């Protein structure tokens, strides 16, 4: 008999107290929802929501010789102390080992936030070449997202002057103006003890939200998820992330990335009939299969089914009428550019 053990974040019993419903994700037991996914999505869009995202990996890297530059697609020379950069860790084939955010703590110190499922893979990939310390167990990570997030976080920390993709350090706490929802927001890295207290204070002012709402929000915002839109086989070019790849510098897999013949690229899809698109559903133009869905959901904001999908390059046209196959039947839709939801804080995107 094989037993599977799922890890719990330091806030697990806080979530139990708040009557969260749990799910297993990337080896972790995480809140899926507290009330309903729809309510939580609407709370973030209209006011603010708070998420425990402590399952993410947090790595500290010392890099006096600037070796990290070769392991990233974006140019670390564009960073300065106090800035955050969205980045990709490429493999030898030009695919993606992980997508990460890089915080420049000092001229030689970098703090990386990596995906939960890829934490050990990234450690194994980088540690033979760089001095690396895994801080994942020493910090909790809380995301406060929504148009009222600045007003709320300012009750606890003086960060109202913080620009997007910037961060401040308060003792051992890091606060960045970053997020994964398309809304304005902050991510807080803090000790487990302080994190429990902070989370309980934040849920008095913002709605606690689970991974269900987080996934809907990121699809509405057109943001990729590793394992769906990103993988070791998919290049940044195929997911329209070229702006995060500096081809003027050297990095692992650069030549392979440029040589790969791209036949399909990521695009958006909205259903014009009732239905919910899901990962793996096929996309058709007439009788011809032109692609597949990588992520799909019902959008409470738009009141319709939406999806991210890989489709033939020549079919990537706004308003192109298509169909998806849902349990043996065809459902009509149209191709759309993403993000699907454009908020006043639309600049708050990766």
Swiss-Prot record:
Pfam families (alphabetical): GCV_T, GCV_T_C
The keyword Protease belongs to this UniProt entry's keyword annotation: no
Superkingdom as given in the UniProt entry: Bacteria
Key words, A-Z: Aminotransferase, Transferase
A cellular component annotation (GO) from this entry: glycine cleavage complex
Class of the enzyme per the UniProt entry, highest EC level: transferase
Reactions performed catalytically: N(6)-[(R)-S(8)-aminomethyldihydrolipoyl]-L-lysyl-[protein] + (6S)-5,6,7,8-tetrahydrofolate = N(6)-[(R)-dihydrolipoyl]-L-lysyl-[protein] + (6R)-5,10-methylene-5,6,7,8-tetrahydrofolate + NH4(+)
A GO biological-process term: glycine decarboxylation via glycine cleavage system
EC number: 2.1.2.10
Gene Ontology molecular function, alphabetical: aminomethyltransferase activity; transaminase activity
Gene3D superfamilies associated with the record: Aminomethyltransferase beta-barrel domains (3.30.70.1400), Aminomethyltransferase fragment (4.10.1250.10), Probable tRNA modification gtpase trme, domain 1 (3.30.1360.120)
Alphabetized NCBIfam families for the sequence: gcvT, PRK00389.1
Its biological purpose: The glycine cleavage system catalyzes the degradation of glycine.
HAMAP family tied to this protein: GcvT
Protein name as it appears in the record: Aminomethyltransferase
């Amino acid at each position: 008999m094989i037993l599977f053990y799922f890890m719990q974040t330091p806030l697990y019993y806080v979530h139990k107290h708040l009557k969260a419903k749990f799910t297993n994700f990337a080896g972790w037991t995480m809140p899926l929802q507290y009330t309903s996914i729809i309510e939580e999505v609407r709370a973030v869009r209209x006011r603010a929501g708070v998420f425990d995202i402590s399952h993410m990996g947090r790595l500290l890297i010392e890099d006096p010789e600037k070796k990290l530059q070769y392991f990233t697609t974006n140019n670390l020379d564009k960073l300065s102390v106090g800035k955050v950069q969205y980045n990709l860790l490429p493999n030898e084939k030009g695919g993606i080992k992980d997508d990460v955010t890089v915080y420049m703590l000092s001229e030689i110190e970098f703090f990386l936030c990596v995906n939960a499922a890829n934490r050990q893979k990234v450690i194994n990939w980088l540690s033979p070449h760089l001095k690396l310390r895994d801080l994942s167990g020493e910090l909790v990570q809380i995301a406060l997202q929504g148009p009222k997030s600045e007003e709320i976080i300012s009750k606890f920390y003086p960060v109202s002057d913080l620009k997007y993709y910037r961060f401040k350090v308060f003792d051992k706490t890091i606060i960045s103006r970053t997020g994964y929802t398309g809304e304005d927001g902050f991510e807080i890295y803090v000790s487990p003890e302080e994190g429990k207290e902070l989370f309980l204070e934040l849920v008095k002012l913002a709605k606690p939200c689970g991974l269900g709402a987080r996934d809907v929000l990121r699809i509405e915002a057109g943001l990729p998820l590793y394992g769906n839109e990103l993988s070791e086989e998919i290049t940044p070019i195929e997911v329209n992330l070229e702006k995060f790849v500096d081809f003027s510098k050297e990095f692992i897999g650069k030549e392979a990335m440029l040589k790969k013949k791209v036949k399909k690229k990521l695009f958006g899809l909205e259903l014009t009939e009732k239905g919910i698109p899901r990962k793996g559903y096929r996309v058709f133009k007439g009788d011809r299969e032109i692609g597949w869905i990588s992520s799909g959901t019902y959008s409470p904001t738009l009141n319709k089914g939406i999806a991210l999908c890989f489709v033939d390059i020549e079919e990537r046209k706004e308003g192109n009428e298509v169909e998806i196959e849902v349990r043996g039947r065809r459902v009509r839709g149209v191709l759309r550019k993403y993000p699907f939801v454009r908020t006043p804080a639309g600049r708050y995107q990766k």
